[in-house]
Amino acid sequence: HKLDSFIGLM
């Protein structure tokens, strides 16, 4: 998921 990837780079 896009949101999951966004959180992954946090």
UniProtKB/Swiss-Prot annotation:
<dbReference type="GO" id="GO:0005576">
    <property type="term" value="C:extracellular region"/>
</dbReference>
<protein>
    <recommendedName>
        <fullName>Neurokinin-A</fullName>
    </recommendedName>
</protein>
<comment type="function">
    <text>Tachykinins are active peptides which excite neurons, evoke behavioral responses, are potent vasodilators and secretagogues, and contract (directly or indirectly) many smooth muscles.</text>
</comment>
<feature type="modified residue" description="Methionine amide">
    <location>
        <position position="10"/>
    </location>
</feature>
<dbReference type="InterPro" id="IPR013055">
    <property type="entry name" value="Tachy_Neuro_lke_CS"/>
</dbReference>
<keyword id="KW-0527">Neuropeptide</keyword>
<keyword id="KW-0964">Secreted</keyword>
<keyword id="KW-0027">Amidation</keyword>
<comment type="similarity">
    <text>Belongs to the tachykinin family.</text>
</comment>
<dbReference type="GO" id="GO:0007218">
    <property type="term" value="P:neuropeptide signaling pathway"/>
</dbReference>
